[in-house]
Amino acid sequence: MMAFAPPKSIDGPKMQTKMSTWTPLNHQLLNDQVFEERRALLGKWFDKWTDSQRRRILTGLLERCSLSQQKFCCRKLQEKIPAEALDFTTKLPRVLSVYIFSFLDPRSLCRCAQVSWYWKSLAELDQLWMLKCLRFNWYISFSPTPFEQGVWKKHYIQMVRELHVTKPKTPPKDEFTTADVQPIPGNSPDEKQSPSLAFRSSSSLRKKNNPGEKELPPWRSSDKHPTDIIRFNYLDNCDPELFRLGRRKRSEVTPDFKRQLRDKKNKLQDRARLRKAQSLISLSSPPKVPVRLAWPLHLPVAPSDREAATEALLEHLQKHPGLQSPSPRLQSQS
């Protein structure tokens, strides 16, 4: 028993353990001291190793670890290393996720609904789509049941499909005439006239002969700042013509300001007339007043009396014979 007893003095000259390979198993204080010394020595070695040597050491240590120790390492790595692709809807509260989705346009919400089932349930909430429908005064003519989900989204899609999109109408042939290019008298036949000069001369002659006649629309060159790549949300985009005029007005001040105001006023009046004509055309068409949209299930109205209810139940059972199930009945004995 005396051979395994702990030594009386630890700091003596015989108890220096820095250069020894002895591991005290029965003395906890000496064991902790040896462990700290060897851990510091291992850290110095690890600092001097190359990257490949460090990888080999880490791989060997992970292979020696048990399952619980490997899970511990995994948790530590997740705390130290930030996640590259983290679903914010799983970490943030549901209210904040819905608030973030409320800033998206309808097309982006439809794309978000294709990510996962949870995103689909968030992107089809009535709290998001109801505001987008009420923005254009699109209401539903019924009160949905608590089990109907995504009613306002379907209503928005249906109303967008029913929008009256008018195609651009080509002007009649009588309004525009082709340019009749003729040589100006007085020039020698040998001289060649440029096409632009000939077009200007013919247009000036046509103006003098027919002052009330309309001209051909001017040819528009390619846009230096193309807008074709801009996302096409046609319900949210502003009028490009008004935006262009406002930008030009801010950038430069033209001397003929009255003429620009008059042209702008005429354009606005033309748009108002066009909208009025479109509304008259829509009013002349037969109105469609759906009592209820097509997607909700129509439940049969409960009849008032008992006989009508029995007849409706019998008709329903005849249409669906698989629903009939024999049920035992108790016969009362007289």
Swiss-Prot record:
Probably recognizes and binds to some phosphorylated proteins and promotes their ubiquitination and degradation. Part of a SCF (SKP1-cullin-F-box) protein ligase complex. Residues 194-204, 323-334 have a biased composition (Low complexity). Residues 86-132 form the F-box domain. Residues 210-222 have a biased composition (Basic and acidic residues). It comes from the Eukaryota. Residues 168-222, 314-334 are annotated as: Disordered. Pfam families: F-box-like (PF12937). This is F-box only protein 16. Keywords: Ubl conjugation pathway.
